[in-house]
């Protein structure tokens, strides 16, 4: 989000490519109030967010809010204002979605964008995503429409009353966010339409509601379509991380060749904090803040902290990425 020179060349840095902001409906702290950055309360929250980003150890973050880029837009706008705190880290735009899939869960999917992506491209990206059932482009209005379309039985599962969503837009928006699913083909199409390679598919694998939930033997075409098209996967299993980047280990040796054959070519594997608050509680994996990687599964990338640096790591994932407390080279 800011231009800097990196005279020391590529070096190992912590990257947290999965954090949320107060714009995310699933946020553990104080959420944004309606009105955008023009609200004084929201401005204070953004300043608190900037302070937390600067204080935490990672050099790079990606804001992965559910269904929206509002957190990203608010951060960008605040940084342009007089008197804004200075952001000392690299922040990428991102979004977290749920895909319609042959699973018992709502399949988790992300997209990461360059920090130089124009706002209009992000708006166009959302308009290409199709919300299942109502067949509308993703928007707040679409989420509210979905909530008012689905049955009362489905709403009850989430503790929501039908009458509430009929008469309260905020409750309808929340309900829609809880149940919405995006058409998978529209997800792929939306990524492909982003110009200049500024969007990267990012699939959780064995983390929460990830692709591993799909029974690939029964739904091979669906599984393989996402398995091969996603340049980045999220995993906290070290043997599986090694299999993604192309490294055979004693723990993955039995299935490594078939895994790589299905994958097509090595992919970058990362582990994000999935932070839903600015500052977490030490030792509590359920209350992780920015840079609080679970169980010391820290993502390290040896590249400049830029979008081009990320692309370089995607091309050379084995030698430019590591998940763990510290890369061996830094232990020497």
Residue ranges and their predicted role:
Residues 180-192, 198:
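Internal active-site segments that recognize and position negatively charged phosphoryl groups
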Residues 114-185:
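Low-complexity, serine/threonine/proline-enriched polar segments
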Residues 1-59, 69-123, 127-129, 206-332:
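Charged catalytic cores and adjacent phosphate/nucleic-acid-binding surfaces used
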Residues 65:
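Nucleotide-cofactor and metal-assisted catalytic machinery
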Residues 193-213:
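Aromatic-lined carbohydrate-recognition surfaces of secreted/lumenal glycan-active proteins
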Residues 192-195, 223-225:
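Short, conserved, surface-exposed binding loops centered on an aromatic residue
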Residues 53, 70-73, 161-164, 193-194:
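A broad, low-specificity signal for short, low-complexity segments enriched in glycine/proline
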């Amino acid at each position: 989000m800011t231009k800097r020179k990196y005279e020391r060349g590529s070096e190992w840095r912590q990257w947290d490519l999965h954090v949320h902001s107060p714009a995310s409906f699933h946020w553990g702290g104080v959420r944004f109030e309606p009105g955008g950055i023009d609200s004084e309360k929201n401005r204070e929250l953004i300043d608190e967010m900037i302070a937390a980003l600067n204080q935490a150890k990672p050099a790079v973050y990606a804001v992965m809010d559910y269904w929206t880029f509002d957190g990203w837009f608010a951060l960008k706008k605040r940084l342009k204002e007089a008197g804004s705190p200075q952001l000392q880290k690299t922040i990428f735009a991102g979004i977290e979605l749920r895909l319609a899939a042959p699973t018992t869960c709502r399949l988790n999917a992300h997209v990461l964008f360059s920090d130089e992506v124009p706002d209009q491209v992000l708006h166009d990206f959302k308009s290409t995503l199709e919300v299942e059932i109502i067949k509308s482009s993703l928007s707040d209005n679409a989420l509210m429409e979905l909530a008012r379309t689905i049955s009362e039985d489905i709403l009850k599962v989430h503790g929501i009353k039908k009458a509430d969503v009929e008469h309260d837009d905020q409750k309808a928006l929340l309900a829609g966010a809880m149940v919405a699913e995006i058409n998978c083909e529209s997800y792929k199409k939306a990524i492909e339409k982003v110009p200049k390679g500024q969007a990267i598919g990012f699939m959780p694998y064995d983390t929460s509601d990830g692709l591993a939930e799909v029974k690939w033997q029964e739904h091979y075409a669906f599984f393989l379509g996402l398995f091969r098209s996603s340049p980045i996967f999220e995993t906290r299993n070290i043997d599986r991380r090694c299999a993604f980047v192309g490294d055979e280990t004693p723990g993955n040796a039995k299935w490594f060749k078939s895994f790589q054959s299905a994958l097509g070519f090595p992919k970058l594997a990362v582990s994000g904090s999935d932070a839903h608050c600015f500052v977490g509680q030490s030792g509590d994996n359920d209350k992780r803040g920015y840079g609080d990687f679970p169980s010391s599964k820290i993502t390290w990338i040896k590249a400049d902290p830029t979008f081009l640096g990320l692309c370089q790591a995607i091309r050379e994932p084995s030698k430019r990425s590591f998940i763990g407390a510290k890369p061996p080279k830094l232990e020497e």
